[in-house]
């Protein structure tokens, strides 16, 4: 199999908006992909096209029927993108809102008494919802501790928290602070052995852009993404629910279809952008497989993305040619360590006893966009056990280049020399 090279990266970058330049601040290198990925040009064009159409779905006219077909096609494309053979996709306000909604409905569809199991690695979107509904239902909330050293969760650590009265289990597919992925299939297998009827809800928001989703293999009940972190745009979230959760009691209009999860008129253009994402992944996958099946192309693209981003983060950490990597700088500490196979396109670090926001501000002045994570309600679950007040998050994607990494390392060397 071939891999993404710098020539292909140039072609990839032609597919995206604002690759080199921020429309507000000017030229910049974008290493803030965990905050939101770049948007496909095709997704922007699709959004513009559908934003001007006044018609709604469900009417007896050609435009309305066409909109219905677009949504139907988008759901089929989502099925290929995420590999689902059953269940239902639907749209909501955001990824966070959908996690709250799925967790709420999973809890309300479960027997009284028991527990919800989550992990200290999770984003507050799932942890907050799980804790709220544990209190509402008088459940026990149990948290699986993540490994501070590796920045991820060992699936075996779930075993002691799961019992036959576990009602809901939440899993984060990748952390937006540590940058580490989790082993969904292994965790799910442990859950099913002890609590076969528990609902398993996965936060896929951070993972989605970094190389492959395979829901069919996970044995779960819910999966949520934020499309603006998967090459689409802001303004909506996408959720998948299993048939078991789809048919469970949930919010719906009185007299409407019993298994419908959509609330209100959907943004057809938003759905259509997910077809653009699917087509992009197929286009990329064709570089690595001769198979004409779209799912195989998407899988090939995912493997290539993972490999490329691994090489890029290795360069960030270990350097290249005469450029030192972050690991070579004195007093630099890196979340998850240096050789972590769970890393997904993200490096979080600090310079000991030095404010991270000053580093981020310096890099921003050099035209490199990164982000400060502080010990607040978003990140204290990761930073507090480390004894850190903050960190610098450098988050890349497969459209970033080796020359951009070199510029970052060069700027960090100049910063340290000061």
Role assignments for model-derived ranges:
Residues 1-418:
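Pyridoxal 5′-phosphate
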């Amino acid at each position: 199999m071939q891999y993404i090279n710098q020539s292909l990266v140039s072609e990839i970058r032609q597919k995206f908006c604002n690759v080199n330049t921020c429309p507000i601040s000017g030229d910049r290198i974008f290493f803030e992909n965990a905050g939101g990925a770049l948007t496909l040009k095709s997704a922007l064009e699709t959004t513009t096209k559908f934003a001007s159409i006044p018609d709604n779905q469900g009417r007896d006219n050609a435009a309305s029927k066409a909109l219905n077909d677009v949504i139907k096609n988008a759901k089929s494309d989502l099925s290929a993108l995420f590999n689902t053979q059953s269940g239902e996709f639907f749209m909501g306000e955001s990824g966070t809102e959908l996690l709250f909604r799925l967790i709420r409905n999973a809890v309300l569809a479960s027997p009284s008494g028991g527990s919800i199991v989550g992990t200290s690695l999770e984003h507050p979107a799932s942890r907050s919802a799980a804790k709220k509904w544990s209190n509402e239902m008088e459940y026990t909330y149990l948290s699986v501790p993540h490994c501070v050293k590796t920045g991820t969760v060992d699936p075996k650590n779930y075993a002691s928290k799961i019992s036959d009265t576990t009602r809901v289990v939440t899993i984060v597919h990748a952390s937006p602070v540590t940058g580490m992925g989790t082993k969904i299939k292994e965790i799910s297998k442990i859950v099913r052995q002890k609590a076969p009827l528990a609902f398993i809800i996965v936060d896929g928001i951070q993972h989605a852009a970094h190389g492959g989703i395979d829901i069919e293999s996970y044995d779960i009940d819910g999966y949520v993404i934020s499309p603006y972190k998967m090459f689409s745009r802001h303004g909506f979230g996408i959720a998948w629910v299993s048939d078991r959760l789809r048919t469970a009691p949930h919010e719906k209009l009185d007299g409407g279809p019993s298994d419908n999860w959509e609330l209100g008129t959907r943004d057809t253009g938003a759905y259509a952008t997910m077809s653009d994402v699917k087509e992009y992944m197929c286009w990329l996958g064709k570089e690595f497989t001769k198979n004409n099946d779209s799912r195989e192309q998407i899988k090939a693209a995912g493997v290539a993305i993972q490999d490329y981003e691994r090489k890029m983060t290795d360069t960030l950490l270990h350097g290249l040619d005469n450029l030192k990597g972050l690991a070579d700088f004195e007093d630099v500490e890196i979340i998850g360590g240096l050789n972590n196979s769970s890393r997904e396109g993200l490096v979080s670090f600090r310079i000991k006893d030095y404010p991270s926001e000053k580093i981020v501000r310096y890099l921003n002045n050099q035209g490199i966009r990164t982000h400060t994570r502080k010990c607040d309600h978003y990140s204290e679950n990761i930073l507090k056990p480390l004894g850190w007040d903050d960190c610098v998050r450098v988050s890349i994607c497969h459209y970033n280049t080796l020359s951009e990494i070199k510029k970052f390392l060069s700027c960090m060397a100049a910063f340290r020399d000061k």
